[in-house]
Amino acid sequence: MAGRGKAIGAGAAKKATSRSSKGGLQFPVGRIARFLKAGKYAERVGAGAPVYLAAVLEYLAAEVLELAGNAARDNKKTRIVPRHIQLAVRNDEELTKLLGGATIASGGVMPNIHQHLLPKKAGSSKASHADDDDN
């Protein structure tokens, strides 16, 4: 029976490598593949689809976390809280468009004062009174 089965003295079985590590990702490709199959989004799921989706999700998470970290640092804090995520998302035009309908729990609101409620500037009000006196 030479040539069949495992050779005697052959090395141990090759160690399994995850699809996440093959793709250089931190997000779980296998779990995303399982969710895609269980979700019945399509009858079949290609091999590259969960890898691509994991890469996209990882990129978006990294982008939001980077901006939230900057917001936390601007507020002299070392821990990111939901308020920092809210500020990061709402100050970025593309993320606001993507997450416009999403509500971030404990995120608060964006600081905004309507222009009509702000006090009038002293220099501009004198100029407008001078124009009124000419008529």
From Swiss-Prot:
Give GO cellular component annotations, separated by semicolons: nucleosome; nucleus
The UniProt record lists the keyword Nucleus: yes
The principal location of this protein is nucleus
User: What are the alphabetically sorted keywords of the record?
Assistant: Chromosome, DNA-binding, Nucleosome core, Nucleus
Q: Where in the cell is it found?
A: Nucleus; Chromosome
Pfam family for this entry, one: Histone_H2A_C
Q: Which GO terms describe its molecular function?
A: DNA binding; protein heterodimerization activity; structural constituent of chromatin
Query: In the UniProt record, does the keyword Protein transport occur?
Result: no
The entry assigns this protein to a family as follows:
Belongs to the histone H2A family.
Question: What does this gene product do?
Answer: Core component of nucleosome. Nucleosomes wrap and compact DNA into chromatin, limiting DNA accessibility to the cellular machineries which require DNA as a template. Histones thereby play a central role in transcription regulation, DNA repair, DNA replication and chromosomal stability. DNA accessibility is regulated via a complex set of post-translational modifications of histones, also called histone code, and nucleosome remodeling.
Q: Fill in the subunit field for this protein.
A: The nucleosome is a histone octamer containing two molecules each of H2A, H2B, H3 and H4 assembled in one H3-H4 heterotetramer and two H2A-H2B heterodimers. The octamer wraps approximately 147 bp of DNA.
Q: What is this protein called?
A: Probable histone H2A.8
Naturally occurring in which organism (per UniProt): Oryza sativa subsp. indica
